[in-house]
């Protein structure tokens, strides 16, 4: 299935605010977010079209929330299978670890299968909404140089024509073999797994059982995954001495599939590819006016499906900060918080993915025996079993420093964590997810109180200039009490009672939420003004030049 790029007339000497190297998922998400912020963006891709073979197969709740932030989630959902469980099986087929979280604190199912090329196509189509975003395919980045106030890119087209791009910033989303990262001599430390895996995708799923199974077979570990649109993926470890060419031969492919299918001859093969699993992390994510994101910054084994999702976290974290800097609303020191916040969590996800791979295919035979023995204990330790079932082992992003203002003990503070996204009731009676009411920018959310009460006129002006939405949350039965309305404040009803529980748990009545839905600060009305001043300083926010009109929200 070839996904052709839009018919774009080539031009020479492009001048933009942001150049993005790579039209993969991270580059396209960056382009969509920056596009809706009004930033002038150019995406350059060396291939002539999007990659059309499946790679990632797992998209989580945080990534779907990111899709929601750019208005694409409704187009993405048809290419997903929600509530997709992951089950580890012993060689005899006994399930010893069942990862099946049923929580939706961020508004979406926590684990989902998906077809990456179709979702990438949604994002490519998404950028066409913005006249300020252009995508140029068949453009190889041959060289680039940094100046004090810009980056110069030298491109070559498929016909050999040279083009020059001038950009204020360059975001490298050009994959694990990133030309940008290598040119800058940024160390990419880590390991490459000794064994490769062959991935086989089959149409008209011959099994059609739901979920994904990781079979810990000591002879040849394998994976069986149900994907949307009746696609079945099998992954088999390539054993020492085997080559991709050998495994592609019909008799050898038949032998592989006979492990998992009663009739390996009656299948509709889509493709087979051999992959090497790497675990590597760039030493730096920002080098002056160049920023690394996605696989250019970190790569990890596939076993927890977090490579794609980590890239989405990068895009969401970086895009809003870059937009503020370009718009003159923050100084470029804000961009230093991108590495400060994202690098440690990316490392944690790499470590988790490596551990999951070692459970599936232990490096030593005795480790597999130990795994099988320990797995029996899970049946007799319900708390431990729930720990896996509810996916509590997944390191949730929590930032201890960066673009946030924390006071008190970090361990129990909600600051630096993603804010929940329950359903809320609007004053017209509509019920929607919280982010839909907030929009794409900052929000100051108050439980029961007028969030403007503790702010000075100057502070209101400063935060309105950022597009901040001021939200008053009330019990749903109070949503139509007109006397509680305040100019410039959106009132929402707590449809599910989750917001009341959140504020009660964290002993706060106000939360400052960043555009990437992370909690930047908490306060009570009497401390909000002081907290916002400290937060503005930490984020290096600038003062608005002109008054911002007060919005009346009905």
Swiss-Prot record:
A Pfam family reported for this protein in Swiss-Prot or TrEMBL: FAD_binding_3
UniProt catalytic activity: 3-(3-hydroxyphenyl)propanoate + NADH + O2 + H(+) = 3-(2,3-dihydroxyphenyl)propanoate + NAD(+) + H2O; (2E)-3-(3-hydroxyphenyl)prop-2-enoate + NADH + O2 + H(+) = (2E)-3-(2,3-dihydroxyphenyl)prop-2-enoate + NAD(+) + H2O
Gene3D superfamilies the record matches: 3.30.70.2450, FAD/NAD(P)-binding domain
Pathway: Aromatic compound metabolism; 3-phenylpropanoate degradation
Enzyme class: oxidoreductase
EC number: 1.14.13.127
Cofactor: FAD
Transmembrane recorded as keyword: no
The protein's name: 3-(3-hydroxy-phenyl)propionate/3-hydroxycinnamic acid hydroxylase
Native species: Escherichia coli (strain K12)
Gene: mhpA
